[in-house]
A protein has these predicted regions:
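C-terminal subdomain of the subtilisin-like protease fold in secreted/lumenal serine endopeptidases
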Residues: 22-26, 227, 254, 258-267, ...
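Autoinhibitory N-terminal propeptides
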Residues: 1-113, 121, 223
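Subtilisin-like serine protease catalytic core
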Residues: 109-239, 256-260, 287-291, 303-305, ...
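Hydrolase catalytic cores
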Residues: 193, 215-223, 249-259, 289, ...
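Short acidic, glycine-rich surface-loop motifs adjacent to enzyme active sites
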Residues: 218-219, 245-273, 295-296, 414-420, ...
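Active-site core segment of subtilase-fold serine proteases
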Residues: 129-190, 207-209, 255, 345-430, ...
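C-terminal tail/sorting-segment detector
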Residues: 665, 684-707
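N-terminal domain-start motif of subtilase-like serine proteases
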Residues: 7-27, 70, 91-142, 172-187, ...
Length: 707
């Protein structure tokens, strides 16, 4: 069993609980847990024997509802090789840094007219959906584009076949529901879904795939735990999230459409193997026309990792003295010593531990205490092999204060041993410096990609920024950190992963992105801080809605998901590997002095249009520019309409088929700002339009000619 499940069994009385465990404590009254199980042989018979129910499976990996009282017995069955689960993650949003206008690509102005996501399902698993926001209708309000929602938190579960919550699959059901169960207090999903797939209604804040179908899953994260009945918390795990991914892919399969999923949530990686079966299950769900995009995380604003190499006697850091259970992890293939010191007003207390001593203890767990100023710090060290390289041993250092009172002590941790190569991973502690020992200043803002973005096959997205301020609805300028255009925002998580792979894969604008905000959240939290970042309020069908500016990799992720929806429209059987190949060949480097891919920028910043040209083979037509034209080009009926800014020289227009054959050529004289051309002679299909001449409009776009 994975560690969280073992802790759950201890709480139920099946095992003795050990002091200082880093696992979060929950109510022990849950009747079952949703978990991954690897079963060899007759899986249905094994699960039935222990009162468990299979919810889904791929190969020999099952997602099952398991009675907590049967976990220990099931884990000892000879046909069961692993049971894995851990609780919910968190929404990846920085609530203190928001602002500004979207790039033209986000507004839909720089996207080719031929590709809008039509015929593609965009899935979003998130929290806080306003199902009534007009951005989820078509631009002209003639069609409602949310097609299904599985609300995992719903308490309307009579006759529901779902392990938690229920789903809503008709327009009447969805609009009557109006918002997800957590929708009065959360709005994150409204914003991310709007970025990926919003029509923009009557605003410039159009999503990247504004004509796609939308399928939603409202799941559980730390943010919306208050909306969950305490006795049901154990039902919400990564296994439940995996069922959510499957739900969206299954919906798309029923409709005969490709699907890309945007997931702007995550949790820390680990060396215990919490995600082994999770990643295998996600890998099995993906394939041709089935792609998952996930946010890298917002962890790089702080120190998260450091390395003590062989040949260096020691390296260390101060840690913020905890008010609750805190943890960090050390990893090495060689023995070393750990020194922790607590500093009081006039005294110190030191704990010096050798890793060999910890490994010699029962269950490789050792507990001790540090004490100053009548305050006690309980320290527990647990050793186990890395799930990636088994000859490397990991040490989880958990520490918990007892009798906390001011003034708080100071705390330091040092890694000692000249012959040991050791890595430090933050866990949930905070690395600091202190004049008490200025040499203890280790720490880098790296190695902090979250899961499941760290999964090899999932496309991991980091965030860049272009503007630093926005005029809010009250006429006040709201300002965030200033970055050069295209630079990674400081909090956007950085690789490598715990097993050494480069992540993120790609960057997209995630700083100061404007998208939809929930009318129900606005109604119930009108004085909330984030409402001061609303850039507009507007009426729609007797409610007041908002457009809001937000920052985080949560916002960058749906930009990439929306882009892949356009690519799926061009190539419905696009695989995750092919999508990454498009990213590899067409992304834009921020700093050309760097080699790519790298752990800050991946392959660079997404280029939606260049990706389409690459997929369609148009990038091989030498006379077609890879730069999108600034002219407004559209097709209405069988007429091509071009709107030009004031130009100083004649403009030529050429049309090419996807095979590279020039099918039309026209000259537009100086002084003509609007021009129309008949397309009656052309067969239906996609064509490249190349506009040349004046530098203001030099570039290309794609059009679609219908019957």
């Amino acid at each position: 069993m994975s560690p969280w499940l073992r802790q759950l069994v201890r709480q139920e009385g099946g095992l003795s609980n050990k002091a200082g465990s880093r696992v979060a404590q929950h109510s022990s009254s849950a009747d079952e847990v949703c978990a991954f199980v690897r079963i060899h042989g007759d899986a249905e018979a094994v699960l039935q024997r222990y009162g468990s129910k299979a919810l889904a499976h791929k190969g020999n990996i099952y997602i099952a509802a398991i009675p907590v009282s049967q976990l220990y017995s099931l884990s000892n069955n000879e046909n069961v090789s692993r049971i894995e689960a851990r609780p919910y993650g968190q929404a990846l949003l920085d609530s203190a840094a928001r602002a500004v206008n979207l790039l033209p690509a986000h507004e839909g102005r720089a996207l080719p007219q031929a590709f809008t996501g039509k015929g593609v399902v965009v899935g979003v698993m998130d929290i806080g959906f306003d199902l009534t926001h007009p951005t989820f209708y078509s631009r002209d309000l003639s069609s409602y584009r949310i097609k299904a929602l599985w609300d995992m938190l719903s308490r309307d579960t009579l006759n529901s076949s779902f392990p938690v919550g229920r789903d809503y699959t008709t327009e009447d059901e969805l609009l009557t529901l109006a918002h997800s169960y957590d929708g009065l207090n959360q709005t994150h999903g409204t914003h991310t879904a709007g970025i990926a797939a919003g029509s923009g209604y009557d605003s410039p804040y159009r999503g990247v795939a504004p004509e796609s179908d939308i399928c939603l899953v409202a799941n559980a994260v730390s943010n919306n735990v208050p909306d969950i009945e305490p006795e049901k918390l154990h039902k919400f795990t990564f296994a439940t999230d995996a069922l959510g991914f499957k739900y969206m892919f299954d919906y798309a399969e029923q409709q005969g459409k490709p699907c890309v999923i945007s997931f702007s949530e995550g949790s820390g990686q680990d060396f215990k193997g919490y995600d082994v079966l999770y990643y295998e299950m996600l890998d099995s769900l993906m394939g041709p026309g089935r792609i998952i995009v996930s946010a890298a995380g917002n962890q790089s604003y702080m120190k998260t990792w450091f390395h003590k190499p062989i040949g260096e006697q020691g390296r260390g850091t101060f840690l913020k003295y905890p008010s609750s259970l805190h943890q960090f992890t050390l990893k090495s293939a060689e023995p070393f010593n750990l020194r922790m010191v607590v500093y009081g007003e006039s005294q110190t207390d030191t704990l010096l531990l050798s890793t060999d001593f910890v490994l010699a203890q029962p269950d490789s767990i050792y507990t001790d205490t540090l004490s100053v100023n009548n305050q006690l710090l309980v320290v527990q060290v647990e050793a186990y092999p890395s799930c990636y390289i088994t000859n490397e041993i990991c040490f989880d250092v958990n520490y918990l204060p007892i009798g906390l009172s001011e003034p708080y002590p100071y705390l330091s941790a040092e890694i000692l041993g000249i012959d040991a190569d050791v890595e430090f991973w933050r866990g949930n502690c905070q690395l600091l410096t202190n004049v008490l020992n200025p040499s203890l200043n280790a720490g880098e803002n790296t190695h902090n990609i979250l899961s499941p973005s760290s999964s090899p096959r999932i496309i991991c997205v980091g965030a860049t920024c272009y503007r630093d301020s926005v005029l809010n609805v009250s006429g006040q300028w709201r300002k965030t950190d200033t970055y050069p255009h295209g630079q990674r925002i400081s909090m956007s998580s950085v690789g490598p992963t715990m097993d050494g792979r480069i992540k993120p894969d790609v960057m997209a604008p995630g700083g100061n992105v404007i998208s939809a905000y929930s009318s129900y959240y606005l109604e119930h939290h009108s004085d909330a801080y984030d409402i001061t970042w609303d850039v507009a309020h507007f009426p729609f069908r007797d409610r007041t809605y908002a457009w809001n500016s937000n920052t985080g990799t949560s916002m960058a992720c749906p930009v990439v998901a929306g882009a892949i929806a356009l690519w799926l429209q061009a190539k419905p059987d696009l695989t995750p590997e092919e999508a990454l190949d498009v990213i590899r060949h067409t992304s834009k480097p921020y700093d050309t002095s760097l080699s790519y891919p790298n752990n800050e920028y991946g392959y660079g910043e997404l280029d939606v249009y260049a990706g389409l040209l690459y997929l369609l083979g148009i990038d091989q037509i030498k006379d077609v520019s890879k730069q999108h034209t600034s002219a407004k080009v559209s097709v209405r009926g069988r007429q091509l309409h071009i709107s030009l800014p004031a130009v100083n020289s004649p403009v030529s227009l050429r049309l090419y088929s996807l095979s590279g054959v020039q099918v039309m050529s026209q000259q537009i004289p100086v002084g003509h700002s609007d021009y129309s051309i008949s397309l009656a002679a052309l067969a239906q299909g996609v064509y490249a339009v190349q506009i040349s001449g004046d530098a203001k409009v030099q570039g290309s776009t794609l059009i679609r000619v219908n019957e």
